[in-house]
Regions:
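C-terminal catalytic/substrate-binding lobe primarily of soluble NAD(P)-dependent oxidoreductases
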Residues: 2-248
Length: 248
């Protein structure tokens, strides 16, 4: 699709809501705190990997298939480390579509020190604030029946097409919670997260992917992966995006 990649931004967002809860994260709050409050890693050509402050580069991205606009910010995620090792891009970053409310909640958790892993003494009992917070919230694995909406993961690629013209696309997969619950009995975020290593293991087992040592999934041919994704009943799509700001 591209002769030059200016930027590769992984964008992950949803419009999921849980009936009966004002705040019930669809993924582990312990892990979410780790990813969102650690300094985000960004890659830039000529600079390499560097970190920024949490919640940097706020933008509103319009996610497809009815999810709509969501506030997205940089977070720490492994794709930023893996992609630049094999793919020539001027910039690589990862953004979560957390939404304004979730961003405010995470900032408050940090301000109150509830993100701390180190234990504190509470009436003679040693307690980790983050563990306490996690135990106080509903287990995401149990929320599927009450969850409504869709989740989306994809890559926003900007650069030049094969003819040297500005091009921007969002390559994505959307999972509807109603579908994943009906077909697999798993809520959408858990299913979309788990299907990736399942497909990777199949491709390694049947010899399509032949890794040696430690490898990132982004380093292998993508078509066999995308074909298997559809065999599991889901699909991937390419949406054209605004090319403003892309220069030849």
């Amino acid at each position: 699709l591209f002769s030059r990649i200016d930027s590769c931004t992984i964008l992950d967002g949803s419009n999921l809501r849980v009936d009966g809860y004002d705040f019930a994260p669809s993924f582990s709050i312990w892990t979410t705190i780790e990813e969102c409050l650690n300094p985000p890693v960004v890659w830039e050509d000529g600079r390499g990997w560097y970190t920024t402050t949490p919640f940097s580069e706020l933008e509103i991205f319009d996610f497809p298939e009815g999810i709509g606009p969501v506030e997205c910010v940089n977070v720490e995620h492994e794709e930023v480390v893996l992609i630049p090792q094999k793919i020539d891009a001027k910039k690589v970053n990862f953004k979560y579509g957390l939404g304004a409310e979730f961003i405010t909640i995470l900032k408050t958790i940090n301000m109150l020190g509830m993100d701390r892993k180190e234990t504190v003494e509470v009436q003679g009992v040693s307690v980790s604030p983050r563990d306490l917070l996690t135990a106080s919230l509903p287990d995401p694995a149990t929320l599927g029946e009450r969850m409504r909406g869709k989740t989306c993961a994809g890559a926003l690629i900007k650069g030049l097409d094969k003819q040297g013209n500005p091009k921007a696309v969002y390559i994505y997969n959307v999972v509807d919670n109603a579908w994943s619950m009906k077909e697999f009995g798993d809520q959408a975020v858990v299913w979309q997260t788990a299907i990736n290593p399942v497909i990777a293991l199949e491709l390694i087992h049947n010899g399509t992917w032949k890794p040696r040592g430690v490898n990132g999934p982004e380093w292998f041919e993508s078509k066999p992966y995308l074909d298997l994704l559809e065999e599991y009943g889901t699909s991937w799509h390419i949406r054209d995006e605004d090319t403003a700001g892309i220069t030849k």
